[in-house]
């Protein structure tokens, strides 16, 4: 059967899961110590596989050094907020960021390196455009004849509408068999190749 810890790890973890698990582990260890002391087996506790020593004093020193490391890491994790505010002035940071913005993203960069003269160019162009709108005289477009269309218009054959599908088309392809066709043979010319 699966271990309860393994089942808990399969469930989606939330932020507080490690805290609840640590409390339950410490509560279980307190209960189990009382029962283990009463039912102590001969031969002592089981040793780790990588432990090849026979002395129990080394384990106590290692445990003490690990506790000291945990206390030191907890002290490092504590942050002195008042000291941080004293060492770091946030208003200076804001001013520095604003200066960087002004230096790197100035109007010259935004307006494609044209500088301040770009405003003057736009003003002059707008004035010229307004003057052009005041003078609203446009020439009439001239009609230009196209040689293709003029050739079609000179054609002597009358214009016809396209043939509708059902009106003049023969009903079967066999009706086309009796139409007369004229074929003429042309001499081969070597000039084409």
UniProtKB/Swiss-Prot annotation:
Induction: Cell cycle regulated with a peak at late M/early G1 phase mitosis. Peak of expression during metaphase. Strongly expressed up to mid-prophase I and decreases during late prophase. Not induced by stress. A motif (DEN-box) lies at residues 14-16. InterPro entries: Patronus. One of its GO terms (cellular component) is nucleolus. Disruption phenotype: Reduced fertility when homozygous. High level of gametophytic aneuploidy. Occurrence of split sister centromeres at metaphase I. Pans1 and pans2 double mutants are lethal when homozygous. Increased mono- or divalent ions sensitivity resulting in primary root growth inhibition and increased lateral root density. Hypersensitivity to microtubule-depolymerizing drugs and higher frequency of anaphase bridges under stress conditions. Keywords: Cell cycle, Cell division, Chromosome partition, Cytoplasm, Meiosis, Mitosis, Nucleus. Coiled coil: none annotated. Signal peptide: none annotated. The keyword Cell division applies. Expressed in somatic and reproductive tissues. Expressed in inflorescence, young buds, roots and basal portion of young leaves. Expressed in proliferating cells such as apical meristems of roots and shoots, expanding cotyledons and leaves, root vascular tissues, and in stomatal precursor cells. A motif (D-box) lies at residues 46-49. Required for the maintenance of centromeric cohesion during interkinesis, until meiosis II. Required for regular configuration and segregation of sister chromatids in meiosis II. Also required for centromere cohesion during meiosis I. Involved in spindle organization at the end of telophase I and in meiosis II. Required to prevent precocious release of pericentromeric cohesins during meiosis, but not for cohesion establishment and monopolar orientation of kinetochores at meiosis I. Involved also in somatic development. Patronus is Latin for protector. The DEN-box is not essential for the meiotic function. This is Protein PATRONUS 1. It comes from Arabidopsis thaliana. The gene is PANS1.
